[in-house]
Amino acid sequence: MKFAFTDEQRMLWDTSQAFLADTSSSRAVRMACASDRGFDDALWRRVCDDMYWQGILVPEENDGLGLGWVEMVIVLEAAGERLLTSPLFAVAQSAAALTQCPKTACRDALFGSILAGDIVALALSNPSSDWHCVDARVDTSEGVTHLSGEAGFVSCGYAAEHVLVAAHNADDTLSLWSINPSQEGVRIERTPTMDQTRPMAHLYMD
């Protein structure tokens, strides 16, 4: 099978390279990594306003670009080449997860938050090195839903306005929940990483 980029995809690569060459220099990366946030908020705003990369995987019906993983990977590869320090990877994960969810008002609102430049993080894996195991659980009693457990390796979770949590239901199926990281019973701690351009966090729920 022969694979080749379309003209539009090659243009996306070229514009991504040009933008990142101008904004993600070695000095800029080092300054972002050393900052309290771990990334440059002003640069993230430019990514959202000028490039609209946060909208690549968001469906057109939600005012996104409605593109696919080929286009997303083009941008992520360019970002990785330039060591772009930003919430882009976290937001791409979350947008991809939301596209697999039923169409609801909550889903639409979260897509809107992503397009507005909010950081929406995805808490998927348990705190161990086993990336295939979800630790969080959801229980419903007398109409009240309660999430408990932990999640590790949450990309940019410490800076997120919303966190999407994968959790086991009572019948052991999986569901996705949106939580406010500042609500009672939720604690998020930034965790040190070898790759300082990819800041991570640990999520606790009780």
Residue ranges and their predicted role:
Residues L67, W131-C133, C156-A160:
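Short glycine/proline-enriched turns and hinge-like loops at secondary-structure junctions
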Residues E150-R187:
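A short core secondary-structure module
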Residues T85-A105:
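N-terminal glycine-rich flavin-associated loop
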Residues A116-P127, V165:
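A short, Trp-centered hydrophobic/proline-enriched beta-strand micro-motif
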Residues H132-S148:
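Cytochrome P450 C-terminal beta-domain/meander region
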Residues C133-D135, F153-V154, N180-D206:
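Flexible, small-/acidic-enriched active-site or ligand-binding loops
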Residues M1-L88, A109:
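Amphipathic, small/basic residue-rich leader segments at the start of a protein or domain
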Residues T99-K103, S125, V165-H168, S178-P181, ...:
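Short beta-strand-to-turn element immediately C-terminal to the catalytic PLP-Schiff-base lysine
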